[in-house]
């Protein structure tokens, strides 16, 4: 994309250098070039701002994943839909630092939330005596980040997981 823009600008520069910048088409072309250059700078600034915020959030949590709550509560299927619509998903911590970042959200709100455990899981943080399918087929995390079997009909805090591929 940049190569095409640069090639176009080079050809345009050659055209304008031949004295065509005084006619209406040349002036319009100059205006378009200026607009493209402004848009390129704005895009670079937005990209830098986004990456700075992402790095700051990652630095604070120790995780490349971001765990966010909208403070609502609900059952598993409703929460799954909320997270899907937001572009995220129900948390699925794969490492201890991700589980800690998730637990920080739960501790801040003093509530439990659903999570999804991959099968087979690379990382688990089951509480003593867990999992216990008699308690349910879903999994919830407490405010300390320990995992427990739970009913999928429990009303728990909405927490969605987001991650960026950079």
UniProtKB/Swiss-Prot annotation:
Residues annotated as glycosylated: 122
PROSITE patterns: C_TYPE_LECTIN_1 (PS00615), C_TYPE_LECTIN_2 (PS50041)
InterPro entries linked to this entry: C-type_lectin-like, C-type_lectin-like/link_sf, C-type_lectin_CS, CTDL_fold
Single GO MF descriptor: phospholipase A2 inhibitor activity
UniProt note on tissues of expression: Expressed by the liver.
Record Gene3D superfamilies: Mannose-Binding Protein A, subunit A
Ranges for domain C-type lectin: 46-161
S-S pairs: 83-160, 138-152
Similarity field: Belongs to the alpha-type phospholipase A2 inhibitor family.
Name of the protein this chain belongs to: Phospholipase A2 inhibitor clone 02/03/06/07
Species this protein is from: Lachesis muta muta (Bushmaster)
């Amino acid at each position: 994309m940049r190569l095409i823009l640069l090639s176009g600008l080079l050809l345009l520069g050659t055209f304008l250098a031949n004295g065509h910048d005084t006619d209406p088409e040349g002036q319009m072309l100059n205006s378009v070039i200026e607009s493209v250059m402004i848009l390129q700078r704005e895009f670079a600034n937005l990209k830098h701002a986004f990456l700075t915020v992402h790095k700051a959030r990652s630095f604070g949590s120790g995780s490349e994943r971001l765990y966010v709550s909208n403070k609502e509560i609900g059952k598993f299927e409703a929460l799954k839909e909320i997270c899907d619509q937001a572009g995220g998903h129900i948390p699925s911590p794969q490492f201890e630092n991700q589980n800690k970042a998730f637990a920080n959200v739960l501790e801040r709100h003093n509530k439990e939330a659903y999570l999804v455990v991959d099968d087979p899981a690379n990382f688990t943080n089951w509480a003593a005596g867990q999992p216990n399918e008699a308690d349910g087929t879903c999994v919830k995390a407490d405010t300390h980040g320990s995992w427990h079997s739970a009913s999928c009909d429990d009303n728990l805090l909405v927490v969605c997981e987001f991650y960026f591929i950079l």
